[in-house]
Regions:
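Catalytic, metal-anchored helix/loop core of enzyme active sites in primary metabolism
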Residues: 1-185
Length: 185
């Protein structure tokens, strides 16, 4: 669909998850992926050229890690944020069936897991992941700007695709480099 004409009510509908307005909009324009890459970088510092964003429409695989020894590990769980939150709080020592009605499942009847590359023309927001974004206060500027823009979109003040256009303008602004790249005192 033409993103320019997407209304807040449409952007909030997620096919697999029930989430709040803000995170649903971040998911619909792929800002959630941008924020996830920044989060991964902060937790596990890596060369910013060494990541790849992929889409998993089934929303069951939440992370994939490729190891130098040739192994690959997947983090697979149902579309319920209770699972990662409970495991973080209880340090992976929780029987999730006590908290959730969902049981662990795996694709049935030979159903395969599907993955696809992000179409950067359709989701240009992922192009904001330049090396500058990882530096010092870059993530803070991105997140704060996005918060304001999503709120403006929800209130009908800007269009859906304006979120990206304004964010891009922020990161192209000469003052971004002036403030974001400096180390905090």
């Amino acid at each position: 669909k033409d993103f320019k004409n997407i209304k807040p009510k449409e952007a909030i509908k997620h096919p697999n998850w029930q989430m709040g307005k803000k995170i649903s909009i971040d998911s619909s324009n792929m800002m959630n992926k941008v924020l996830e890459v920044i989060e991964a970088f902060k937790l596990f510092p890596f060369n910013p050229d060494k990541y790849k964003i992929i889409i998993h429409p089934q929303s069951l695989v939440h992370a994939i890690v490729f190891f130098k020894n040739g192994q690959t590990k997947f983090l697979y769980h149902e579309t319920d944020m209770l699972i990662p939150i409970a495991n973080a709080i209880y340090e992976n020592k929780i029987d999730i069936e006590i908290l959730s009605r969902k049981k662990n499942s795996f694709p049935k009847n030979g159903q395969s897991l599907k993955f696809q590359e992000i179409d950067k023309k359709r989701f240009p927001i992922v192009t904001l992941l330049s090396k500058n974004i990882f530096q010092n206060s870059g993530p803070i500027i991105l997140n704060a700007s996005n918060e304001v823009l999503v709120d403006s979109f929800i209130k009908g003040k800007i269009t859906f695709n304006s979120i990206y256009l304004y964010l891009r303008a922020v990161f192209r602004d000469k003052d971004f480099r002036k403030y974001a790249i400096k180390k905090a005192p």
